[in-house]
Amino acid sequence: MGCLGNQLLIAILLLSVYGIYCTQYVTVFYGVPAWRNATIPLFCATKNRDTWGTTQCLPDNGDYSELALNVTESFDAWENTVTEQAIEDVWQLFETSIKPCVKLSPLCITMRCNKSETDRWGLTKSSTTITTAAPTSAPVSEKIDMVNETSSCIAQNNCTGLEQEQMISCKFTMTGLKRDKTKEYNETWYSTDLVCEQGNSTDNESRCYMNHCNTSVIQESCDKHYWDTIRFRYCAPPGYALLRCNDTNYSGFMPKCSKVVVSSCTRMMETQTSTWFGFNGTRAENRTYIYWHGRDNRTIISLNKYYNLTMKCRRPGNKTVLPVTIMSGLVFHSQPLTDRPKQAWCWFGGKWKDAIKEVKQTIVKHPRYTGTNNTDKINLTAPGGGDPEVTFMWTNCRGEFLYCKMNWFLNWVEDRDVTTQRPKERHRRNYVPCHIRQIINTWHKVGKNVYLPPREGDLTCNSTVTSLIANIDWTDGNQTSITMSAEVAELYRLELGDYKLVEITPIGLAPTDVKRYTTGGTSRNKRGVFVLGFLGFLATAGSAMGAASFRLTAQSRTLLAGIVQQQQQLLGVVKRQQELLRLTVWGTKNLQTRVTAIEKYLEDQAQLNAWGCAFRQVCHTTVPWPNASLTPDWNNDTWQEWERKVDFLEENITALLEEAQIQQEKNMYELQKLNSWDVFGNWFDLASWIKYIQYGIYVVVGVILLRIVIYIVQMLAKLRQGYRPVFSSPPSYFQXTHTQQDPALPTREGKEGDGGEGGGNSSWPWQIEYIHFLIRQLIRLLTWLFSNCRTLLSRAYQILQPILQRLSATLRRIREVLRTELTYLQYGWSYFHEAVQAGWRSATETLAGAWGDLWETLRRGGRWILAIPRRIRQGLELTLL
C-alpha cells in the first residue's frame, strides 16, 4: 500500500507539472505569408497617351516582376473577380469613350427614302439615279479565290464578289430650331439601320423608320469620339496581390495548381470587342490550348501563333462627315455622298487550314471531350438566327463596326461542298464581305443601342487572330460542331483567367507553450533589414511555419514598407492626373483603390490593438488554445495550409482574445486605483472622504439590520418556549409587568427557559438584558467558530500527517539515492582522473625512452656513415705502405 501511495503521489505531481507547463496558448504572429480570396476593385495602368488612356488609367512604368511560390492554389477562369471586373470595365470604357448622351427618339419618325425598282438601294443626285445591274444566279464554282498582299484587287477594291455598300438617301420633315416651323432634312443611312415598308408600285419612295425605335433607347455620341482599342493592365491595391497559375496544362479550371507565381499587376491586355474571333491577344503561344467551362460547352480556343493568322479589313472610300443641327441639343452626323461607296471587306492571311486542323486535334485530346475521334467529323459552323452580332462576325475597325458574312471563309477552311448552297454563298474564298451599321447592339447591356457617328477617310486595320470563341457540341460520337460564339466576355477570360485576386492576411494565430510575451537577453542585430518590395515577404509562402516565423520582423517591415511605397506611387500619379480623373468612372476607381489600401492597413492595426498586440511581430497571450488536438507541424506545414485548418476556429479565438484584452485593461485599471493609496496626500482627498462617509453609513445600516435580525431570532425563541410578548408596542416601551402568583398553587422548583422569578412577581428587563444577551450570542458564535475551525484543522492535520510523512520519507529516500549516485559519480570521476593521469605519465615516460633510444640509434648510424671515408682513407694508406 505504501508503494502504491507513493506511485499515486508521484503521478499526481507529474500530471500537475504537465498541466502547468504543457498548456498551449494562442500566439499572434504579424507578417505571415498567407492570403484569402478578395473581390475589391482593381485599377488599370496603360502606356497609351491618347485621350482615353489619359482619362481612364494611370501611367504604366512597366516594372512588374513575378515571384514564384512553392504553394498549391485553385484557379477558375469563370468564377473569377478579375475577369468579371475586366468585362464590366471594358464596357465602361466603351460607354465612356463614345459618351452617348443625346436620345435620338425625335428621329423615330417617318422618312421618305428612295427605293426604286431600278435601283433597289438608290442614291439621288440632281434627279439622277445611279443604278447597278440586278444580281443574277451565279453558276456553281469549284474555284478557290485567294488574295494576298500582292493581289491587285486589294488596292483597287474590286475583288470578285464584292459589291457596293447598301445605303439609302432619305428625307424627313420635323421642327428644328424654330419650334413653330417645320424644316426638311436630307440624311444618308446604311440600309441595315432602317426598317422600310413596301411602297406603291408607281412611287419610287418608301416609308422607312430608324431601326430599334420600338425596342430600345438609342443615344448618340455628344462629341465625335471613336472606339479605338487600347492596351492596359490591371494592378492590385496595396495590401492585395495577384496570383497566376503558371501551369501549361491549365484549361480554365484547376483546383490544385502547383506552379503559382505572384505579382502586383497582370500582363498587358487589349480592349477587344468582337465576336467569333479574338484579336491581338497576349496569350498566344507555340501551341493550341482550350479554356473549357466547367459546367457547359462554352470554350475559348487559343490559336497557335506559329501559323501567323491575320485578318486585314478595309472600308474603301474617302468619306466626309458633316454635323447637322436638327434641334437644340441634337447634332446628327450626316454623310453627304454622291456615289455609293465600295463595300467593306476583310481577308485572312496565314495557314488557316493547318491551324483549324490543329484545333480539331486539340479538341479530341481534351479530357472534357467525349465525342468522335475522327477529325473529319468535327466541323466549324456558323450560328443560326439571333442578333446580327451573332449571325455575322462583328468587329471594330478604327471606330467603324463591321458585320462580316463568313460563309466564304468557312467554305474555304472546311473545303465544303458548295453545290447545295445559295448562289451568293457558293464560293470558297479567304476574304469575306462586310457591311457597316451605325446603330449597334451593345454587347454587355441587353436592350440598349448606341448610335456611332461614321468615321472619316479611308479606313484600314490589321489584326492578329489569336483565339476562337466557340461552343463545342457532339451527339453520340457521330458529329461534332464547333459553333462560333458571340460571347465577347470569353475573350477576357482567356486573357485574365489564369489570375486570381487575393488579400494578404499578415495576421496568423497558432498555439505555443509560452503564456506571455517576454523579451530575451540576446542582443539585436545592428544590420538593417533589406526590403524586397511589397511582395518580397511572400517568397516564404512555401516555407515551413517555423522557418517563416524566424523572419517575421523582416517580413512585417517589408509588408509595411511595400504598402507605404505603393500608396506613395499611387498617390503621386493620382495627383498628377487629378484634373483628368475627376469626372471619369475609372478615376473614381483609382481613388477608391487608395482608400482601400489605407483601410486595409488600419484594419489590421486596429485588430492587433484590440488584442493588445499592437506593433508586435510575435505576441503571446493568456488565452488557452481551444483545440488541443489541432497543433501545427512547424517543420512541414506552411502558413497558408495552417490558416485553412484553423479557419473554423478563427471567430472563436478572436472573441476570446478580445475578452482577454478587456479583462487585462480592467485589471490594469484596478491596479492603478490601488497604486493611488501609497500617496499619503490622497487619503485626505475630498473624493476619499466622501467614500469614508459612505462606508460609515454602511456600518450604521449594518448594525441596525443586525439588531433587527437578533430581535426576530429572540422573538422566535420566545414563541418556541410558549411565551408570546405583547406586539402592540416595541420592547423599549415594555414595563415590568408584575403578576401575582396564586398562593394556593405549588411553587415550581425549576425554570424552563427564562420563566418567572421565584416569588410572586416576574418581569422582563429588556433594556438591561439586551446588551448582555448580545454579548453572550457573540461569545457563543465566536466559540462555535473557534471550535469548528480547530476541529477542522485537527482533522485536516490527521489526514495530511501520514501523507506528509510518506512524502517526507519518499523525498528522503530520493535524496539518499541521489547522494549515493553522486558519491558513485565522484568516486568514478576521481578514479577516471587518476587513470588518465597515470596513463599520461606512462605514455610520457614511454615516449621519452623511445625517443632517447631512437636518438642514440640515429646518432650511431650517423657517426658510422661519417666514418666511412676515414676508414677508406686509412685502408688506402695501409695498402700503400
From Swiss-Prot:
Entry's Gene Ontology cellular component terms:
host cell endosome membrane; host cell plasma membrane; membrane; viral envelope; virion membrane
Which first-to-last residue range defines the signal peptide? Answer: 1-19
Where in the chain is the site Cleavage?
R527, G528
Query: Where is this chain glycosylated?
Result: 37, 70, 114, 148, 158, 186, 200, 204, 214, 246, 249, 280, 286, 297, 308, 318, 373, 379, 462, 478, 627, 636, 652
For this UniProt entry, the molecular function terms from Gene Ontology, in alphabetical order, are:
structural molecule activity
Q: Where is this site: In-frame UAG termination codon?
A: X736
Q: Which residues form a coiled coil?
A: 636-668
Chain spans, region Fusion peptide = 528-548
**Disulfide partners:** C44-C57, C101-C222, C108-C213, C113-C170, C235-C265, C245-C257, C313-C346, C397-C461, C404-C434
- Listed Pfam families: GP120, GP41
Q: Where is this motif: YXXV motif?
A: 723-726
Say what the protein does. Answer: The surface protein gp120 (SU) attaches the virus to the host lymphoid cell by binding to the primary receptor CD4. This interaction induces a structural rearrangement creating a high affinity binding site for a chemokine coreceptor like CCR5. This peculiar 2 stage receptor-interaction strategy allows gp120 to maintain the highly conserved coreceptor-binding site in a cryptic conformation, protected from neutralizing antibodies. These changes are transmitted to the transmembrane protein gp41 and are thought to activate its fusogenic potential by unmasking its fusion peptide. Surface protein gp120 (SU) may target the virus to gut-associated lymphoid tissue (GALT) by binding host ITGA4/ITGB7 (alpha-4/beta-7 integrins), a complex that mediates T-cell migration to the GALT. Interaction between gp120 and ITGA4/ITGB7 would allow the virus to enter GALT early in the infection, infecting and killing most of GALT's resting CD4+ T-cells. This T-cell depletion is believed to be the major insult to the host immune system leading to AIDS.
The extra comment attached to this record reads:
This is a macaque isolate.
Q: What is this protein called?
A: Envelope glycoprotein gp160
Q: Which organism is this protein's natural source?
A: Simian immunodeficiency virus (isolate K6W)
